[in-house]
């Protein structure tokens, strides 16, 4: 989403309780691990490999298993010889890990192409962005009073506290659970935000119900495909999509993943991991990974394993845990299904109340929660490579559009949104947790030296959140391996860091 509908929030984070004893057994002789496995080569897995290399040094072997494409949900589709983002497409200016990755890899920021946003309620456009910032602010005030100011103050307070994570990680501190991390940043207030509906929190702030219905709900729908009953902390992350200061990587965001694997000198294993089993040899504990490649089946032993792929049954990771005592329970919760449809065609602007497409000024249309609406958003999208002379197609021209919807669009629905079209490409994702389908947050530590990254997605899903979780797990794995307990789950870190300086 582009524009100034809200001056809002982005950012990050991670996971729940420990299964087993996180600190035992120790590495026996003080030697570094010889082999580490990362399962999953999306942004979380790629960043984990990078950070593991930073902390464990050049000698350790880092293998990254990926059954599909590197980049995971940072995927692209091709239309008329141009690639377009079909997955994760925006990054916030305060996403410091992602910014550092781009700098280290020598990648470039994609040139921004201006475009206005509007909100549609199924009958008419009820809120629209103009070329005049002051006019937009006046309209917000006229329609919603000071709700947007109250929201901005709330968001700024959250951001100020949450940005502490970068300082903590720069000083090497790690957390064994999301509760510990949240508590260190914002105390019980942050933890409670993961349990309380966004709508309740906003109403308590004095934000009007109308503002929630017409501004907040559309942002939730486009970013997570869900409504304002999602937890408040997740809602704050989602509101990042309403900011101006967003960016993307020239050539596609997935280039970050392949680049991180390269500079980490990681071995990419194109394989499906089928099973993980603990192997005890004296006091030493290793994990046997059984996997399938195009050439057949195999297995290898690893000292440390990081799972950077969702483990919930609804996603179908294919990973089984064998021989663990006690046995692993199935991780609770489901992932939310959403459909990204990339259409090359002519937008039916009359559906939105503009009979003449030349008078349709919007690049993005968000929607309110209306029973008859079959889509969450539709937007004119730009290719991942933007030339100096590129301009966004006008509505009377054939353009490339991305439609988010809860279900695949049938022909009649496509005909409703488009006067005609040349091509349709459909990607069905399970990109986000279905918030409210699980009580509590998944663990970071499944077993000694066995870590789970994707529990972060139950606190909020974004590229930077996965990157923060990756850094946390790399630090946690390093400190656990080396018995540096004073670097894990420490209290009053801001004061402690000040005294270290």
PLM region descriptions:
Residues 478-501:
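Active-site-proximal substrate-binding core of FAD-dependent oxidoreductases
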Residues 73, 81-113:
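Conserved FAD-binding subdomain of flavin-dependent enzymes
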Residues 27-63:
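N-terminal Rossmann-like FAD-binding beta1-loop-alpha1 element of flavoenzymes
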Residues 299-304, 309-486:
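C-terminal segments that line or cap access tunnels to active or ligand-binding sites in enzymes
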Residues 103-104, 108-227:
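Mobile amphipathic helical/loop "lid" adjacent to a hydrophobic cofactor/ligand pocket
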Residues 234-304:
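Helical element adjacent to the flavin cofactor pocket in flavoenzyme catalytic cores
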Residues 53-79:
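Glycine-rich FAD pyrophosphate-binding loop
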Residues 175-189, 217-264:
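Helix-loop-beta segment of a Rossmann-like dinucleotide-binding subdomain
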């Amino acid at each position: 989403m582009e524009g100034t509908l809200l001056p809002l929030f982005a950012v990050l984070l991670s996971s729940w309780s420990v299964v087993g004893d996180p600190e035992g057994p120790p590495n026996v002789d003080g030697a570094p691990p010889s082999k580490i496995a990362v399962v999953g080569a999306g942004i979380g897995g790629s960043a984990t490999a990078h950070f593991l290399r930073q902390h464990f040094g050049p000698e350790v072997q880092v293998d990254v298993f990926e059954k599909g494409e590197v980049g995971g949900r940072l995927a692209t589709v091709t239309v008329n010889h141009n690639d377009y983002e079909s997955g994760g497409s925006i990054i916030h200016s305060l996403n410091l890990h992602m910014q550092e990755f781009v700098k280290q890899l020598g990648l470039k920021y994609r040139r921004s192409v201006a475009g206005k946003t509007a909100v549609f309620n199924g009958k008419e456009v009820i809120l629209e962005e103009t070329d005049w910032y002051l006019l937009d602010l006046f309209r917000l005030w006229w329609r919603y009073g000071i709700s947007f100011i109250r929201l901005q103050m709330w968001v700024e307070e959250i951001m100020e506290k949450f940005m502490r994570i970068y300082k903590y990680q720069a000083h090497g501190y790690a957390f064994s659970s999301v509760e510990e991390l949240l508590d260190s940043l914002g105390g019980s207030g942050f933890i409670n935000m993961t349990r309380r509906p966004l709508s309740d929190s906003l109403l308590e702030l004095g934000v009007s119900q109308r503002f929630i219905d017409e501004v907040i709900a559309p942002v939730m729908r486009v970013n997570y495909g869900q409504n304002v009953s999602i937890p408040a902390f997740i809602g704050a992350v989602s509101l990042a999509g309403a900011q101006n200061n967003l960016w993307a990587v020239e050539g596609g965001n997935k280039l970050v993943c392949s680049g991180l694997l390269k500079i980490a000198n990681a071995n990419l294993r194109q394989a499906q991991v089928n099973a993980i089993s603990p192997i005890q040899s004296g006091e030493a504990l290793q994990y046997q990974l059984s996997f399938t490649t195009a050439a057949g089946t195999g297995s290898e032993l690893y000292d440390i394993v990081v799972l950077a792929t969702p483990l919930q049954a609804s996603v179908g990771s294919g990973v089984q845990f064998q021989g663990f005592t006690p046995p692993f329970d199935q991780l609770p919760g489901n992932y939310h299904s959403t459909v990204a449809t990339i259409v090359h065609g002519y937008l039916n602007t009359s559906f939105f109340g503009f009979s003449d497409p030349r008078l349709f000024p919007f690049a993005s249309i968000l929607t309110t929660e209306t029973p008859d609406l079959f889509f969450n958003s539709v937007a004119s999208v730009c290719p991942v490579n933007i030339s100096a002379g590129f301009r966004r197609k006008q509505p009377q021209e054939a353009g490339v559009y991305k439609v988010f919807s809860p279900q695949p669009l049938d022909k009649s629905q496509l005909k409703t949104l488009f006067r005609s079209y040349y091509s349709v490409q459909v990607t069905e994702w399970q990109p986000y947790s279905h918030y409210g389908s699980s009580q509590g947050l998944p663990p970071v530590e499944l077993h000694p030296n066995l870590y789970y990254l994707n529990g972060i997605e139950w606190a909020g899903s974004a590229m930077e959140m996965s990157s923060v979780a990756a850094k946390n797990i790399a630090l946690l794995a390093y400190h656990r391996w080396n018995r540096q307990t004073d670097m894990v789950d420490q209290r009053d870190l801001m004061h402690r860091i000040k005294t270290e300086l």
